[in-house]
């Protein structure tokens, strides 16, 4: 007799007539007049629970089995048999049931067996992974993360761990969380009356990172192909379905690569992970297509088969200006494209994923390579039907004099970036990279509308519970 996950039983990886033990939680209990109870037991290894058929001849049937309610944890031992009933191929003919943990009061159990609103589930984030929805999201999140690691490993990339605490603002936007151990009641002041960060833990003003990119570039300029994957932080006071204060970013950096190279890399990566999730999480994707977004599976299938369209920003603006559509946000050359603009291009004009390239320099970051026209930079966004921007990237500015000029234009102190500038002084090389917001990717795959519901414990303005 062996302990096996529910997934192994349901997916036929356990031989019929084998004695097994499964461990998990009760989803439902149903009793028949013939003295037989049916327990739906799940352990999170797959979407569906396994049915445990329990005869009233079990010694603890009246004392324990008939008291089991949703959420109780159990250890069930029995024989795997072909199920005569509808809905499952295999079930367990139970010979023993142990109760590992009771639900104290079934009447007040927050995860009672009924459909809960997504807003309610955010209030009980510590229990919401027990629901069908959040459990499925968690498994898809895992599968996507593993697929990303596999893809980059197969492509010869090295994974680099970049710091969460930094003194540099990658985006130059200033929306950063400060890290400090100073006594807020007795802040040290310098001669100008400003807070003296020399007295702080790191001896300077420090922040939570908004991106691992700058640090990643240093390793790309030594290992050639690297990627970072970890949490990043933005102190944006944005209460929208697309924003989190803490979220995960995947950021590859490639030496000797130009904008076209990383556009191709982005396309190959997305198609790889979408194929992986359709193959490995078919049960969860079926649920999303039935209960969340009917297009969840077909959208990914179309994406995998599609040829990416390519368009310059200038041409994209012309398309939008001449399309006859009245947009909520006006479109003209020099404005950053909004979500409605991006979705029009991907969903209605090209009807395919789109790579928009060569944006105006004034709306992009200092590190993006200035094009020969002096007005645009070698930046790109990948726009996906159904969501808009899913990836943003660029060729990095490898010319020190141009980089310094861009920093000056944006009011940045180049001395704060001395180590980043060193890359341009010692064997500089063309290099490129992009960033993928992991939660937006999960939302796109699952059809879940709000990124707060695809990360275990969302951090948003005025909310850091759990």
From Swiss-Prot:
Example of a GO cellular component annotation carried by this entry: cytoplasm
Keyword Manganese appears in the UniProt entry: no
Reaction(s) the record says it catalyses: tRNA(Asn) + L-asparagine + ATP = L-asparaginyl-tRNA(Asn) + AMP + diphosphate + H(+)
EC number annotated for this UniProt entry: 6.1.1.22
InterPro entries attached to this UniProt entry: Aa-tRNA-synt_II, aa-tRNA-synth_II, aa-tRNA-synth_II/BPL/LPL, Asn-tRNA-ligase, Asp/Asn-tRNA-synth_IIb, NA-bd_OB-fold, NA-bd_OB_tRNA
CDD domains xref list: AsxRS_core, EcAsnRS_like_N
GO biological process, one term: asparaginyl-tRNA aminoacylation
Compartments, as annotated in UniProt: Cytoplasm
EC class of the enzyme, as a word: ligase
GO molecular function terms listed in the Swiss-Prot or TrEMBL record: asparagine-tRNA ligase activity; ATP binding; nucleic acid binding
One Pfam family hit: tRNA-synt_2
Main location: cytoplasm
PANTHER family associated with the record: ASPARAGINE--TRNA LIGASE, MITOCHONDRIAL-RELATED, ASPARTYL/LYSYL-TRNA SYNTHETASE
Protein family per UniProt: Belongs to the class-II aminoacyl-tRNA synthetase family.
Subunit-level organization: Homodimer.
UniProt xrefs under HAMAP family: Asn_tRNA_synth
Protein name (Swiss-Prot/TrEMBL): Asparagine--tRNA ligase
Lineage: Bacteria, Pseudomonadati, Pseudomonadota, Gammaproteobacteria, Enterobacterales
